[in-house]
Structures are given as C-alpha cells and as structure tokens.
Amino acid sequence: KLIGIVTERDLLFANSKNLIQDVMTKDVITAKSGVSIDEAKELLHNHRIEKLPLVNESGLVTGLITSKDITNNADYPNASKDNKGRPLVGAAVGVKGDFLERSESLLEAGADTLVVDIAHGHSENAISTVKHIKKAFPNCELIAGNIATAQGAEDLMKAGVDAVKVGVGSGSICITRVITGSGVPQLTAVMDCAKIGRDYGIPIISDGGTRTSGDATKALAAGASTVMVGSMLGGTDESPGTVLTKNGKRFKVYRGMASLAAS
C-alpha cells in the first residue's frame, strides 16, 4: 500500500542516517489505474511534480508515470514497446549449465525475447539449447546465433528459432576469424542465410561489421530484417561500459560477447 514517495530531491541533502520515513513525501498526489496521458500531464503540471504513482481502489500501487515517460513517449513515438509501454528488452543465455533456469527467471522478470548468444552458433550445444528452451517455453520469442553459413541458419531454424543472428568475425573487436581461421564476409553471409530465411519465413539479423549507415543499408539490401550495432553505440552515455579518461579524452570500456570480461 502506498504510504509515501522518495525522489532524488528528498535525498539531495538528507543525512545518510535518516530513515526513509523521515525523508519521504507522505502527502502523495496519485492517480487511478488507467489514467490517460493527458490527465497525467495535467496532474503533473498542476501540482508541479515529476512522478505520479498509480493506485487501485484499495490504495495499492499498480504503476508509476513520470514526466520523463511522457516526454520520451512524445519524442520517440516509434520506439519499440510492450503492451505496458515499456521498451522491449532481450536477454542472452548460454548453452551450458543452468540455461533453462536462467531462461525462466529472465522471462518472469519481463524479458520480451531470449537470445542463445555464443560465438559459434552452428554447434550441437546451441541447437540442443534451442530445442530445450522452445520445449520448455513454447511461446518464448527465441533468437540464436551467431552463424555465418546457410547450413547453420537452416539447422537453427529447424530447431525452432524465431530469428537467426548472422555474423562471425565481422564485429569491430571480434577475433573469431583470426583465431579459428574460419569465417565468411558479412555481406556474403547475410545473403546466403537470407535465402534460407525466406524459405522458412524466419528473419535474419545482421550482427557485426556495421560501422556506418551505409553498412546497415547493405545488410538490409542483402536480406537482413534487422541490423545489430555495437561499436556505433559503445561510446554513448547510455551504454553500460565503465568510463575511462586518457590524455584528456573520455572512453568507454567495450567488450566482445564471448570475452572473459563479458562472461
């Protein structure tokens, strides 16, 4: 039940020894579940607040609308969201150990799609993992990769994936081709896999080698339905890497998906 709200303003000059009940705002402005965006905007503006808790008839919290939610909704109307208005989220799992338990926990936490994400996706472990996840969670949207051949794409599609991630060694920091001596140039790999994808009605994701807008255009023209980017966004404020400063310039730590640091 809602008894108060704590925002950044409440904590700004608070003593670290203070209890939550001592710093929280107790007289909270609320709205009923199902309030419209326009009604929420009016309440936020009239009361000069930034956060609006939503409560049901029993006073239990059912949601929260913030001023940033409303501005983001207006600024980015085409953002990919779920039926609750939240950004779509994908979560990666491996192919060993407790991947089923991890998959269940991620789906319960609200993940919209799972990704069986390993450096060599055309392997018995990856195919077996796909089959087990789809059997346990048949309604789960499942992506698997990475692969670089038509046969790899077909084997994953037969196993039950909903999308295939294509790209081995093409990423900006990927060394798989160098270490293994195996790989396919990205455009060729996408074209080969897209042919199989069309036969099965399953989309292809081009993952790697997208350093410019032109690279994305080529991947889409070659048959990819989606393009994944890493290095293009790796230095943004929103990316999760640690910030380092070298010679007065700011950098972000950037890791490969199969690196020891990432795992």
Task: Give the ranges of each region predicted by the language model.
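Alpha/beta catalytic cores of nucleotide-metabolism and tRNA/nucleoside-modifying enzymes
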Residues: 31-32, 92, 159-162, 181-206, ...
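Catalytic beta/alpha-barrel core
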Residues: 30-32, 51, 92-94, 112-123, ...
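Catalytic cores of alpha/beta
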Residues: 101-109, 142, 148-166, 206, ...
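Short beta-strand/loop segments at the ligand-binding rim of alpha/beta enzyme cores
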Residues: 82-92, 132-148, 163, 196-208
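A glycine-centered beta-loop-beta connector
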Residues: 1-7, 44, 52-68
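Bateman (tandem CBS) regulatory domains
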Residues: 18-28, 83-88, 108, 136, ...
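The conserved cystathionine-beta-synthase
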Residues: 31-48, 55, 71-74, 100-105
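Active-site-adjacent beta->alpha loops and helix N-cap segments on the catalytic face
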Residues: 60-80, 98-101, 118-142, 147-158, ...
